[in-house]
Regions:
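Hydrophobic ligand-binding cavity/cleft-lining segments
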Residues: 1-59, 69
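Glycine-rich portal/gate segments that line the openings of hydrophobic small-molecule binding cavities
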Residues: 53-97
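Hydrophobic pocket/interface hotspot
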Residues: 32-36, 42, 62, 81, ...
């Protein structure tokens, strides 16, 4: 589902997207939560993503390269786990690309919930993505498919990574 209530603003454009995805993983829910709570595991599942530095238990830095055709944008940024409840298996985090001239500013808030499921775990993820394009070159026709494709590929990689790793299988 996408939110389309953002208006174009001069100079440049503001885009706000609200995206959700659900996937099932053939692993124990507590194990899945612990793995997804690790920034290195999570960023490794983002195409073009990598962890560059762990600051402390809640803060980290990373890099994500996003491409569309021949164009690529590299984002260095910081992340912070803003909420975590291991008993409920819920967590939230915030990612922010560092300001770079001539590159759209991107901020992401993500929340996840891991529930028990007949196949092991169900992972529900919600993303709120804000893109500020100061150049005025981007339009929603480019932003929506790029964001959706990146998220779809991330969710597929989460499932593949977790199911391809030795871990607790459901009873």
């Amino acid at each position: 589902m996408q939110q389309r209530d953002a208006a174009d603003q001069a100079p440049g454009n503001l885009f706000v997207l609200s995206l959700t995805r659900v996937t099932q993983v053939d692993r124990d829910p507590d194990w899945v939560f612990r793995r997804l709570h690790d920034p290195e595991t999570l960023l490794a599942c983002v195409p073009g993503g990598s962890l560059t530095r762990v600051i402390d238990a809640e803060r980290f830095e990373g890099r994500i390269v996003v491409g569309a055709g021949p164009f690529k944008f590299g984002y260095d940024g910081d992340g912070r786990i803003t909420e975590s409840d291991p008993a409920a298996r819920t967590a939230s985090l915030r990612l922010h690309g560092l300001d770079v001239r001539h590159v759209p500013d991107v901020r992401i808030r993500m929340s996840m919930a891991v529930h028990g499921h007949s196949s092991g775990s169900e992972v529900q993820m919600s993303f709120w993505v804000t893109v500020v394009d100061r150049t005025g070159l981007l339009n929603r026709g480019w932003v929506d498919p790029i964001a959706n494709d990146l998220l779809d590929r991330t969710v597929r990689r989460i499932k593949q990574e977790l199911e391809g790793t030795t871990g607790d299988r459901p009873a």
